[in-house]
UniProtKB/Swiss-Prot annotation:
It is found in: Cell inner membrane. Belongs to the ABC transporter superfamily. Methionine importer (TC 3.A.1.24) family. It is a peripheral membrane protein. ATP binds at residues 39-46. Residues 2-242 form the ABC transporter domain. Its EC number is 7.4.2.11. Keywords: Amino-acid transport, ATP-binding, Cell inner membrane, Cell membrane, Membrane, Nucleotide-binding, Translocase, Transport. Part of the ABC transporter complex MetNIQ involved in methionine import. Responsible for energy coupling to the transport system. GO terms for molecular function: ABC-type D-methionine transporter activity; ATP binding; ATP hydrolysis activity. This is Methionine import ATP-binding protein MetN 2. SMART domains: AAA, NIL. It comes from Salmonella typhi.
């Protein structure tokens, strides 16, 4: 579906030294998947996204969409290729002097639809995004979430194969963000549209994406299935993002002053549902104190992380045996202190 091959993007201000915004990125995005690109501001993710519809041209490398090298197109051929690629934005980009229906109709007129087919398609797509009753409203009368729904309706009205989402929830509150992500998931499942989404929030990635690429300094530093990236982050930057998302930082005071051994335990799949800690308490006679933890469900797979304290003041070898038992029954054990 989408092939990004060794893409670099350089920007030059005046006669200054070029700044490399995207640095040697290669990715394959399969048809029908929801692919996320995550990174902090300035990571290059927006620039990379814009190469997929040639709003930004690569300085080096190639971008192929549906078997066509879109990075090499211009004129009529580029306009035709872009009709198969919808895009939504952080700040909606609606025409404020036109109604909701006319905002959506505009994209169909621009694509050359017959006049008689535009109104039925507008009604159909507004029903899909839950705005059938807002067709004659103006953007100023809408909430932020409703405005983004108009943006989505406009982007998918022309039956695109690909939908590009540029920080689609960053201007919205948490509850509204969840409804927009649910709508995107519905569109992907119902229409089979490939979605490429960029965000700075790992929670968005966790909620909606099948696979993810992590960007830092213009490079993709890690990519893979979302569950695997959360469960086994390899790059230090990814580890930082995941740790911040799961919020498992232990206060330094506890790390320094609590007796016994401190462990961070990763549970995956079935192991997240087993009474491993109860087993070690009974079998080895150690005291188990849960200091921090949570179980997340990514897709339908459980990912549990616990920070625990193990103590056995009169039997130090019991703690070592308990740790070894936990290692055998869980995905990963990290000794924080002890």
């Amino acid at each position: 579906m989408i092939e990004i091959e060794k893409v670099c993007v350089d920007f030059t201000a005046g006669r200054g030294t070029p700044t490399r915004a995207v640095d040697d990125v290669s990715l394959h995005i399969a048809a029908g998947e929801i692919f996320g690109i995550v990174g902090t501001s300035g990571a290059g993710k927006s620039t990379l996204l814009r190469t997929l519809n040639a709003l930004t041209r690569p300085s080096q490398g190639r971008v192929n969409v549906n078997g066509v090298e879109i990075s090499a197109l211009d004129g009529k051929a580029l306009r035709q290729a872009r009709q198969r690629i919808g895009m939504i934005f952080q700040h909606f980009n609606l025409m404020h002097t036109r109604t909701v229906a006319k905002n959506v109709a505009f994209s169909l007129k621009a694509a050359g639809w017959e006049r008689s087919k535009i109104a039925p398609r507008v009604a159909e797509i507004l029903t899909l995004v839950g705005l059938a009753d807002k067709a004659n409203c103006f953007p100023v009368q809408l909430s932020g979430g409703q405005k983004q729904r108009v943006g989505i309706a406009r982007a998918i009205a022309n039956h695109p194969d690909v939908l590009l989402c540029d920080e689609p929830t960053s201007a919205l509150d948490l509850e509204t963000s969840a409804t927009i992500l649910a709508l995107l998931r519905q569109i992907n499942a119902q229409l089979g549209i490939t979605i490429v989404l960029i965000t700075h929030e790992m929670n968005v990635i966790k909620s909606i994406c099948d696979r993810v690429a992590v960007m830092s300094g213009g490079k993709v530093v890690e990519s893979g299935e979302v569950f695997d990236v959360f469960a086994h982050p390899q790059h230090a930057f990814t580890q930082q993002l995941v740790s911040h998302t799961l919020n498992l930082t232990l206060p330094e005071r506890l790390r320094e002053h609590l007796p016994g051994q401190l462990l961070k335990i990763l549970f995956i799949g079935d192991s997240a549902e087993q009474p491993v800690l109860s087993e070690v308490a009974i079998k080895f006679g150690v005291a188990v104190n849960i200091l921090h933890g949570k179980i997340e469900y990514i897709g339908e797979r459980a990912l549990g992380i616990l920070v625990v304290q193990l103590t056995a003041p009169h039997n130090p070898t019991a703690v070592a045996a308990a740790v070894e038992h936990i290692r055998q029954r869980t995905a990963q054990v990290e000794v924080i202190r002890g």
